[in-house]
Curated annotation (Swiss-Prot):
Residues 84-97 have a biased composition (Low complexity). The modification Phosphotyrosine is found at residue 189. This is E3 ubiquitin ligase ICP22. ICP22 and protein US1.5 mRNAs are transcribed from two different promoters on the US1 gene. Functions as an E3 ubiquitin ligase and plays a role in the inhibition of innate immunity by preventing IFN-mediated signaling. Induces the ubiquitination and degradation of host STAT1, STAT2 and IRF9, resulting in the blockade of ISGF3 nuclear translocation. Residues 62-76 have a biased composition (Basic and acidic residues). The lineage of its organism: Viruses, Duplodnaviria, Heunggongvirae, Peploviricota, Herviviricetes. Residues 1-124, 289-334, 370-390 are annotated as: Disordered. Tyrosine phosphorylated. It comes from Human herpesvirus 2 (strain HG52) (HHV-2).
């Protein structure tokens, strides 16, 4: 607490004995003057008290008439600068008895009429702990800092999902198969690969024919192994459309290592020329190829002929290879026509709802446009709207069988 002396003019105009000290700025405490006791009133003359009271009242009246307010400096007040707030860390010592300020006020002739003070929270001195913390921008109270080192937050492993675990096991198994020298049969891996190929072939122009081709391939590979008919390493390279490079070397090494563990059967078949096709070899590994563009060679068979009927016919003749002229030309042509019709009408949706499929105008009469209001009939041959029958069908140009797709049409056998 620092005392600032008042101005000299204020000392000259106001008596020192009767200038009450000003309370601290911002405090709203009601003060009342101390009533003199009987002994003091008898010792002091009445004239002195009356003269001092008149002088102070005249000064206050003059200040009010002038329209200005006396500053604390002119009133002989004191400025308070609390420097103990930044150094104290404990509770302030607040007693129930009168404090030093109260003694000063009482000695100056004033008594402070204030309510009892409440207990305050302990003040915490905020300080920066050390230079590394300051460089890192860490600001926190020193009393909260513990001596134990802060543990580094360890990242928790994500919860393992069934699909992720399954993919991890599959990738580990594939890596083991690649790195392992000995070949082992893995039926689960073969099943997954075949299933993936079936899913890829769903985007083909003819998914059923492509799927049947894959079935033929897996079946022929099994029968070739069952009959102990083996191919040479170079023949396998031509069959898998790899010529030279890392894949060719790996394929030859794997085949030779497996053949060394078994007794040699017949001589390997090596008479397999390269496929005379427009897309062969490395071009098969390039995406976005035209599947329907250009003319194909004789070796490329249409997917339309690979139907379920042809698969069954091939399975019936598994005993031995059939000669080239064994098939009847008429049956072959009839099978091609049947396969073509099956390809065209295989995806035909036979539903009983009107307007569900774009029906052919040559087979089924179009009634949706005639039912629209405000549109005239496009031709005289179109039948006018007839009353509905009990079964919900309409009587049209075909009296024998109603072509409306309700399940009783001539298109359904």
């Amino acid at each position: 607490m620092a005392d600032i002396p008042p101005d000299p003019p204020a000392l000259n105009t106001t008596p020192a004995n009767h200038a009450p000290p000003s309370p601290p700025p911002g405090s709203r405490k009601r003060r009342r003057p101390v009533l003199p006791s009987s002994s003091e009133s008898e010792g002091k003359p009445d004239t002195e008290s009356e003269s001092s009271s008149t002088e102070s009242s005249e000064d206050e009246a003059g200040d009010l008439r002038g329209g200005r307010r006396r500053s604390p400096r002119e009133l002989g007040g004191r400025y308070f600068l609390d420097l103990s707030a930044e150094s104290t860390t404990g509770t302030e010592s607040e007693g129930t008895g009168p404090s030093d300020d109260d003694d000063d006020d009482a000695s100056d002739g004033w008594l402070v009429d204030t309510p009892p003070r409440k207990s305050k929270r302990p003040r915490i001195n905020l300080r920066l702990t050390s230079s590394p913390d300051r460089r890192a921008g860490v600001v926190f109270p020193e009393v909260w800092r513990s001596d134990r080192p802060i543990r580094a937050a360890q990242p928790q492993a994500p919860a393992s999902l069934p699909g992720i675990a399954h993919a991890h096991r599959r990738s580990a198994r594939q890596a083991q198969m690649r790195s392992g020298a000995a070949w082992t049969l893995d039926l689960h891996y073969i099943r997954q690969c075949v299933n993936q190929l079936f899913r890829i072939l769903r985007a083909a122009p003819n998914p059923p024919g492509s799927a049947n081709r894959l079935r033929h391939l897996v079946r022929d590979c099994y029968l070739m192994g069952y009959c102990r008919t083996r191919l040479g390493p170079r023949t396998w390279g031509r069959l898998l459309q790899i010529s030279g490079g890392t894949w060719d070397v790996r394929l030859r090494n794997a085949i030779r290592e497996v053949e060394a563990h078994f007794e040699p059967a017949a001589e390997p078949v090596c008479e397999l020329p390269c496929l005379n096709a427009r897309r062969y070899g490395p071009e098969c590994d390039v995406g976005n190829l035209e599947t329907n563009g250009g003319s194909t060679s004789d070796d490329e068979i249409s997917d339309a002929t690979d139907s379920d009927d042809t698969l069954a016919s091939h399975s019936d003749t598994e005993g031995g290879p059939s000669p080239a002229g064994r098939e009847n030309p008429e049956s072959a042509s009839g099978g091609a026509i049947a396969a073509r019709l099956e390809c065209e009408f295989g995806t035909f949706d036979w539903t009983s709802e009107e307007g569900s499929q774009p029906w052919l105008s040559a087979v089924v009469a179009d009634t949706s446009s005639a039912e629209r209001s405000g549109l005239p009939a496009p031709g005289a041959c179109r039948a006018t709207e007839a009353p509905e029958r009990e079964d919900g069908c309409r009587k049209m140009r075909f009296p024998a069988a109603c072509p409306y797709p309700c399940g009783h049409t001539f298109l359904r056998p």
